[in-house]
Each structure stands twice: as structure tokens, then as C-alpha cells.
Amino acid sequence: MSFTGKYQLESQEGFVEFMKAVGLPDDMIEKGKDIKSVSEIEENGNQFKVTVTTGSKVLTNSFTIGQEADIETLTGERVKTIVNREGNKLKVVLNRITSITELVDANTLVNTLTLGGLVYKRISKRVA
């Protein structure tokens, strides 16, 4: 299955605790917890461009599977890392955070971020 498409956040679990652990200020956590972000993924072979729009904030990362890339994190920090693909999963380690994005079916994208024992899970549905 191709990741290409636009996905809108439907539900999330563990947002507040996870964002506190990564050092996001309380006011930003409060503003962000109810915003339904939109993720747009463009897949062309092993090349990906991921754009996440949350309110007025737009975060865009481009990478090639298996090659080092400069990725911007949720907190605005830039990290050199490698994104790997395992079937319908994209896996990347950003400092202490492990992110797994899985296309569980043609219309559902699940992003699970893990930091120590904390888990932040985002479930998005395809809108285009």
C-alpha cells in the first residue's frame, strides 16, 4: 500500500503527558490538545515528503528510506537520523523518541511515539 494521501487526526492518546516529557510549554500543550492536525504524505519510490499542519504551524520533512536525513521534531529541534521502512511501517528514532507510522489499512494511519515508558498514539483517517 502507498502512504500517499492526506490524513486528518481523528483521535489521540497520551498527548499531554508525552508533550510535557519532551519539554513543550504548558500553554502550547493546552492549545494543541484539541487541534485536529492534517498530515499530507507524498511517496515516490523510496522518497517521501511529509507535511503536518497543526493550526497555523506547518512542519515539512523530506527523506529517502535508508539514507540519513535532517528531520525537524515536534519541538522544532533538527535531528540527523535514518527512516527505515518495514512493510507498511515507517520507523525512525529522533533522539530519545521512537516513532512508528503504520498504514493499518487503505484509510487509517497510526503514528505511535515512544519515550521511555510514555506512549503517544495518533490515529488519522484518509481524507484525500
Swiss-Prot record:
The zebrafish genome contains duplicated fabp1b genes (fabp1b.1 and fabp1b.2) which probably arose from a tandem gene duplication event. Belongs to the calycin superfamily. Fatty-acid binding protein (FABP) family. Forms a beta-barrel structure that accommodates hydrophobic ligands in its interior. The keyword Transport applies. The keyword Cytoplasm applies. Keywords: Cytoplasm, Lipid-binding, Transport. Gene3D superfamilies: 2.40.128.20. SUPFAM superfamilies: Lipocalins (SSF50814). Pfam families: Lipocalin_7. This is Fatty acid binding protein 1-B.1. Induction: By a linolenic acid-rich diet. GO terms for cellular component: cytosol; nucleus. It is found in: Cytoplasm. Disulfide bonds: none annotated. One of its GO terms (biological process) is fatty acid transport. GO terms for molecular function: fatty acid binding. Binds free fatty acids and their coenzyme A derivatives, bilirubin, and some other small molecules in the cytoplasm. May be involved in intracellular lipid transport. Expressed in the yolk syncytial layer (YSL) and subsequently in the intestinal bulb in developing embryos and larvae. In adults, expressed in the intestine. It comes from the Eukaryota.
